[in-house]
Swiss-Prot record:
Transmembrane segments: none annotated. This is Lipoyl synthase 2. One of its GO terms (molecular function) is lipoate synthase activity. Pathway: Protein modification; protein lipoylation via endogenous pathway; protein N(6)-(lipoyl)lysine from octanoyl-[acyl-carrier-protein]: step 2/2. Binds 2 [4Fe-4S] clusters per subunit. One cluster is coordinated with 3 cysteines and an exchangeable S-adenosyl-L-methionine. It comes from the Bacteria. It comes from Nostoc sp. (strain PCC 7120 / SAG 25.82 / UTEX 2576). It is an enzyme of class 2 (transferase). Pfam families: Radical_SAM (PF04055). SUPFAM superfamilies: Radical SAM enzymes. [4Fe-4S] cluster 2 binds at C72, C76, C79.
């Protein structure tokens, strides 16, 4: 980054509204989690994505583990996660390492997510299941939510392959199945390169088809240039496929290489969006500037 680029990015950070600034949490809680994660050479999206809520979540005994390495095979224009080069081979011991970390941290609720791994035979679906099994062996009282990619691409690409991979995870019975559509239909192309809006809806629809008892969840980030009408359309699309839970948060630009923020939505606007979502029938809604997809997940 050049000096002028650095100055530009610093000015953008300075211009962020006050409601997006908050303390990160107790240093002792952060360092404990970071030490255990580093010792086991595993990853959390809390750290890789620099989540502003990680201190609060750690204090509430929740965390979101990032499976299959920190490098994604896709190049979404909003995401902080590493991308642009070949990902690492899978660690066959990762499930056990995550289970041990859950035990040491005394976590009551765990979210498992992953980078997209289009290079793998089953996109990593079996790795999710293996990790869930390992966690349950050591932590039988811990609930597990999954936040998955769309499982499209690679060998066996297409609807049948996607269905088979999702079925594998549904049969492992997560406490909640989350897949984020991230943005409105019009902006999916520029925001989520390599993803398709209807393909993401299909993920959540398949979960309900395979097991209607499993709660489904999705998330939207605002600030890309969407309108309220487009957000209502997206929420309607989610309700039409039986999606139960919704999170809405503010997009914050991680670097100059990412999409610029078009608008900072106010807390009052988030309250309005949350009210609309609840009126549509979502059973659990989190809508606020700093909300992320796993925010207060254990309270749902």
């Amino acid at each position: 980054m050049t000096a002028s680029q650095s100055a530009q990015f610093k000015s953008e950070i300075t211009a962020m509204p006050s409601w997006l600034r908050r303390p990160i949490g107790k240093a002792s809680e952060l360092s404990t989690v970071q030490r255990i994660i580093k010792q086991r050479q595993i990853h959390t999206i809390c750290e890789e994505g620099r989540c502003p809520n990680r201190g609060e979540c750690y204090a509430q005994k929740t965390a979101t583990f990032l499976l299959m390495g920190p490098t994604c095979t896709r190049v979404c224009a909003f995401c902080q996660v590493d991308k642009g080069h070949a990902p690492m081979p899978l660690d066959p011991e990762e499930g056990q390492k995550v289970a041990e970390a859950v035990q040491l941290l005394g976590l009551r609720y765990v979210v498992l997510t992953s980078v997209a791994r289009d290079d793998l035979q089953d996109q990593g679906a079996s790795h999710f299941v293996q990790t869930m099994e390992a966690i349950r062996q050591l932590n039988p009282g811990t609930q597990i939510e999954v936040l998955t990619p769309d499982f499209w691409g690679g060998a066996g690409a297409g609807e049948s392959g996607q269905r088979q991979r999702i079925k594998m995870i549904v049969e492992a019975q997560p406490a909640c199945f989350n897949h984020n559509i991230e943005t409105v239909r019009r902006l999916t192309g520029p925001v989520r390169r390599g993803a398709k809006y209807d393909r993401s809806l299909r993920v959540l629809s398949l979960v309900k088809e395979l097991n209607p008892r499993i709660p489904t969840k999705s998330g939207l980030m605002v600030g890309y240039g969407e309108t309220v009408a487009e957000l209502v359309e997206a929420m309607t699309d989610l309700r039409n496929i039986g999606c139960d839970r919704l999170t809405i948060g503010q997009y914050m630009r991680p670097s100059l290489e990412h999409l610029p923020v078009q608008k900072y939505w106010t807390p009052e606007e988030f309250e309005h969006l949350g009210k609309l979502a609840r009126e549509m029938g979502f059973s659990h809604v989190r809508s606020a500037p700093l909300v992320r997809s796993s925010y207060h997940a254990g309270e749902e």
